[in-house]
A protein has these predicted regions:
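Rossmann-like AdoMet
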Residues: 1-76, 80-126, 146
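Rossmann-like AdoMet/SAM-dependent catalytic core
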Residues: 21, 195-277
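Short coil/turn segments at beta-strand junctions that form active-site/ligand-binding loops
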Residues: 70-74, 146-149, 178-180, 262
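A short, conserved alpha-helix within the catalytic core of class I
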Residues: 123, 133-136, 160-176
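Hydrophobic pocket-lining residues within nucleotide cofactor-binding pockets
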Residues: 130
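Short amphipathic alpha-helix with an adjacent loop that forms part of the alpha/beta core around
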Residues: 135-146
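A short SAM/SAH-binding and catalytic strip from SAM-dependent methyltransferases
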Residues: 144-165
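Conserved beta-strand signature within the Rossmann-like core of class I S-adenosyl-L-methionine
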Residues: 151, 170-191
Length: 277
């Protein structure tokens, strides 16, 4: 919804241009976005949208660099939700694998069918029930090749995981060959925030907990490298709000701006010598 609102309510040039963000939504959701421009300008909404569009742009910038510099030929989108990169993929020879819970993926595929959006042959859907199925085995079953350099986007997922669940997926990603990348977002722990940011985190935490998806996992830029090293991953870039503002939101007059320091984006590289079986 926030990516879609960005397409119609924010000034040009867009931070993240996604022509399918509105098309994939149900008609009532599209109409709600169009008729409530004032809602998108509220501080909380603008702040959340700012982070989400910067996050998406950053992940696709890392992918683009990987295609140029490391011959990336697979894109893996974990917790894909309504991500539309598989429909927009501009890179010949790049295959996109979308991973999500079976129920969520079924819902998305119905939306795609309702919108009469054609699915390219370069897109594969991989349903995974993480409580009962192996991510690695489901990927292999779908034709994923662990010997091919891959760009992974793992967005909007990590803060909701237990450390055990994070580790299980990170181990799978650490088996990818050198040249592969993993982009994910994470949040600083409450004690690392200013008093006003703690209040904001408390409010947001209450919202997501009420929705049944509480925040569970936090890192700091100091603790993350050691954690990733356990899975043959290393931090290539850790980007905070100030860096995202400078990179993507400078000189804008539409209210898109990141405040505080809670949200970070991590671009992780593979530190092993190649794919392991």
């Amino acid at each position: 919804m926030r990516r879609a609102a960005h397409q119609i309510h924010d000034e040009r040039p867009l931070v993240f241009d996604d022509p399918f963000a509105l098309k994939i939504l149900p008609a009532d959701a599209r109409e709600e976005i169009r008729r409530t421009p004032a809602a998108s300008r509220k501080p909380f909404s603008a702040a959340m949208r700012s982070f989400m569009v910067c996050r998406a742009r950053f992940a696709e910038d890392v992918l683009a660099a990987g295609v140029r510099e490391h011959a990336i030929r697979q894109a893996l989108i974990l917790g894909a939700g309504l991500d539309t990169f598989g429909l927009r993929n501009p890179y010949p020879g790049l295959h996109v694998f979308e991973v999500d819970h079976p129920a969520t993926q079924s819902w998305k595929r119905k939306l795609l069918a309702d919108a009469k959006l054609d699915l390219p042959e370069s897109l594969s859907f991989v349903p995974v029930d993480f409580e009962r199925q192996s991510l690695r085995q489901q990927l292999l079953h779908a034709g994923f090749d662990f010997s091919i350099p891959t760009a992974t986007a793992w967005l909007g997922v990590v803060p909701y995981l237990t450390l055990e669940a994070f580790a299980a997926t990170a181990r799978v990603l650490g088996r990818l060959p050198r040249g592969s990348s993993v982009v994910f977002d994470y949040s600083l722990p409450r004690e690392a925030l200013s008093p006003i940011e703690q209040l904001m985190l408390d409010s947001l935490s209450a919202r997501v907990a009420q929705a049944g998806e509480p925040f569970q996992l936090f890192f700091t830029p100091e603790s993350l490298p050691e954690e990733l090293s356990c899975y043959d991953l290393s931090v290539a870039e850790d980007v905070d709000s100030a860096a995202l503002n400078a990179r993507y939101l400078a000189s804008r007059s539409d209210g898109l701006h990141l405040r505080g320091r809670a949200g970070h984006l991590c671009h992780a590289a593979i530190s092993s010598n190649g794919a392991r079986q």
